[in-house]
């Protein structure tokens, strides 16, 4: 968490620089020196306000998560409360559009996932994000399925989102958002059909 007093105009500048450097050289080689040069600030500013590279990565991920949450919330607000299938699609879509689909954002996500396995603070951020996604999905799926079925399908969709993201970061062409939506919707439709026959 950045210290109080960090000029608000500098945060986006540093977050953008962090992602650009990670995109170019990878997380391990993304030094404070390279990031500060990319952002046009002194290394002292980063160390003072963020306590170093770890703090800056944490703030970068917080910003990515804020953008993701804002995108999904905005899409859901634009839809009727009872348009459950559309709302599920909006949740899925929010993970693959605009800011989230940028290659440098995808690579930062991958670095974050890798780091979060061994870092409690980053692991906590990952859990918050996972819980939020599952909560959104469960809420809509429970209107279409039993609670147990909704839980299984929510985890299935979340796993597909994560898997497609991972494959996208390793693909030189990046994430293919249209294909991702087709794959996940195919899974969702098959699950809804399968469970409707079990009633």
UniProtKB/Swiss-Prot annotation:
SUPFAM superfamilies listed in its UniProt record: Homeodomain-like, Tetracyclin repressor-like, C-terminal domain
One GO term of the biological process aspect: glycine betaine biosynthetic process from choline
InterPro entries: BetI_C, DNA-bd_HTH_TetR-type_CS, Homeodomain-like_sf, HTH-type_TetR-like_transc_reg, HTH_TetR, Tet_transcr_reg_TetR-rel_C_sf, Tscrpt_rep_BetI
DNA-binding region coordinates: 31-50
Domain of life the protein comes from: Bacteria
Start and end residues of each HTH tetR-type domain: 8-68
Keyword Transcription regulation: yes
Gene3D superfamilies (UniProt xref): Tetracycline Repressor, domain 2
GO molecular function: DNA-binding transcription factor activity; transcription cis-regulatory region binding
A Pfam family: TetR_C_6
Keywords, ordered alphabetically: DNA-binding, Repressor, Transcription, Transcription regulation
PROSITE patterns: HTH_TETR_1, HTH_TETR_2
Pathway(s) per entry: Amine and polyamine biosynthesis; betaine biosynthesis via choline pathway [regulation]
NCBIfam families, per database record: betaine_BetI (TIGR03384), PRK00767.1 (NF001978)
Functional note: Repressor involved in the biosynthesis of the osmoprotectant glycine betaine. It represses transcription of the choline transporter BetT and the genes of BetAB involved in the synthesis of glycine betaine.
Protein known as: HTH-type transcriptional regulator BetI
Protein's organism: Vibrio parahaemolyticus serotype O3:K6 (strain RIMD 2210633)
Gene: betI
């Amino acid at each position: 968490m950045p210290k109080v007093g960090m000029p608000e105009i500098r945060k986006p500048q540093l977050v953008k620089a962090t992602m650009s450097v990670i995109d170019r050289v990878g997380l391990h080689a993304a030094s404070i020196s390279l990031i500060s040069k990319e952002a046009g600030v002194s290394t002292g500013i980063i160390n003072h306000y963020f306590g170093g590279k770890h703090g800056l990565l944490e703030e970068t991920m917080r910003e990515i998560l804020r953008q993701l949450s804002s995108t999904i919330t905005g899409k859901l607000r634009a839809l009727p409360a009872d348009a459950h299938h559309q709302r599920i699609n909006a949740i899925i879509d929010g993970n693959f559009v605009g800011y989230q689909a940028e290659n440098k954002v995808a690579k930062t996500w991958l670095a974050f996932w890798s780091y979060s396995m061994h870092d409690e603070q980053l692991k906590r951020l990952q859990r918050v994000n996972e819980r939020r996604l599952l909560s959104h999905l469960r809420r809509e799926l429970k209107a279409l399925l039993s609670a147990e079925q909704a839980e299984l399908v929510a985890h299935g969709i979340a796993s597909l989102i994560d898997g497609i993201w991972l494959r996208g970061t390793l693909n030189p062409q990046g994430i293919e958002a249209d294909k991702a939506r087709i794959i996940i919707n195919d899974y969702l439709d098959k699950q809804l059909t399968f469970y409707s026959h079990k009633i």
